């Protein structure tokens, strides 16, 4: 991971246009190719970002100090450096990922055992389907034979949707699985997470943990 603290301005050109005026900011360049720009007041959420796959070109000569980030859709993030205050790179290695709490692990087990609760005709491929960036909670197929990746959380928030999005981007590169769609499943799904999931074509499923643990009439509310 590369960490750059710099006074910079940022311009985005794509489906929309956006401009961030000059200010001190943190720029993260991760090993997966993503680039994100952060202020000191927004918790984990960046001011702007470019998800992988994308390329970063650092200008030289007349363009020195200008970074251009381009994704596969041709969208551009142009970062104009005025003063670099810090620039360092660190090898973090492979992250072991989040260790699920007991409820999430049990939800995964229950849903895998009763995969048909997602819909008639669903069949399980496997739990903990391993990818290069971590395990997908459940990989299954729907009644039409399409591959479905399911991310399970006790509380569904934006970071869970982002995690599933990364899995989907990777899984859809595999011709043996593609096309792959996503389902975000949780006991409670925050409104912002639902909006983001819907915008990305990801389905949302609210899980009734108590019902799944043994009440005869299993109840899932599908949205």
Curated annotation (Swiss-Prot):
UniProt keyword list: Cytoplasm, DNA-binding, Endonuclease, Hydrolase, Nuclease
CDD domains attached to this UniProt entry: NucS-like
Name of one Pfam family that matches: NucS_C
UniProt keyword annotation of Hydrolase present: yes
Record carries keyword DNA-binding: yes
An example Gene Ontology CC term for this record: cytoplasm
InterPro entries: Endonuclease_NucS (IPR002793), NucS_C (IPR048301), NucS_N (IPR048302), NucS_N_sf (IPR049173), tRNA_endonuc-like_dom_sf (IPR011856)
Top-rank EC class of the record's enzyme: hydrolase
Recorded family membership: Belongs to the NucS endonuclease family.
Purpose of the protein: Cleaves both 3' and 5' ssDNA extremities of branched DNA structures.
HAMAP family the record matches: NucS
Record's protein name: Endonuclease NucS
Species of provenance: Streptomyces avermitilis (strain ATCC 31267 / DSM 46492 / JCM 5070 / NBRC 14893 / NCIMB 12804 / NRRL 8165 / MA-4680)
Chain's gene name: nucS
